[in-house]
């Protein structure tokens, strides 16, 4: 059964759809949802969508049960001089996927020699952050979470869980292939795809690296500027939201202050 709907698709941009029922997202129930505006459709660039996911042979229910088991407490009187690093990952995944594939058999996308490519990258992982590594390519970040920004250039870009990044790249004029890699935060594993013009040599890329993926911080976030920012307007209302939770029970909450668990009611155009 099918149905046709006519509507104004706003907002446009790189979006994604995924289940919020139980733990289905960990079972890879997610897909890209790309809404193109007129400018994107008229753009002189090839589009390549990259969906990143983390995968485990262990069932999501068992993973969640293990996370909620009582944790061993570290002795405060420990004589060890070893520095304790940040707790970056709670789940040991078996693989990291780029468009459903690992680097053992990556997707090879046909592109034009010297052509422009708009990468629409989606972090659909349940519990993993990444650093996007363009290797020898120089990229220009033009949109984040589907929203256009003032261009930001670089070779690496952090991508947190559920985030999206639109990155423009220009392929080498010599016709060589280029890899777009996603290195998992705090892990030596990575995934990615290959952009390859006709006749290009596609070299084998190892899944494992010598070093762990870097910790994701807020440095890039602080540089982001909206291409079309909200109009200046005095704040009319403030709604405090608390981030709470417990590692021991693995329960996390975002209660709105003073609402007793009820939603805050707002009105249209209210700032």
Language-model regions, residue ranges each:
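Structural beta-strand segments of beta-rich domains
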Residues: 115-119, 270-271
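Aromatic/His-enriched, Gly/Pro-containing loop or helix-boundary segments
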Residues: 1-16, 20-22, 153-158
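Short, conserved beta-strand segments of beta-strand-rich sandwich/propeller modules, principally
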Residues: 14-16, 118, 177-179
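Acidic-aromatic/histidine active-site loop/patch
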Residues: 48-115, 122-125, 244-246, 250, ...
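Non-cytosolic beta-sheet module surface loops
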Residues: 9, 21-23, 122-125, 134, ...
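Solvent-exposed beta-strand/loop surfaces of large extracellular or lumenal domains
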Residues: 1, 134-161
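Extended terminal and domain-junction accessory segments
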Residues: 27-68, 149-271
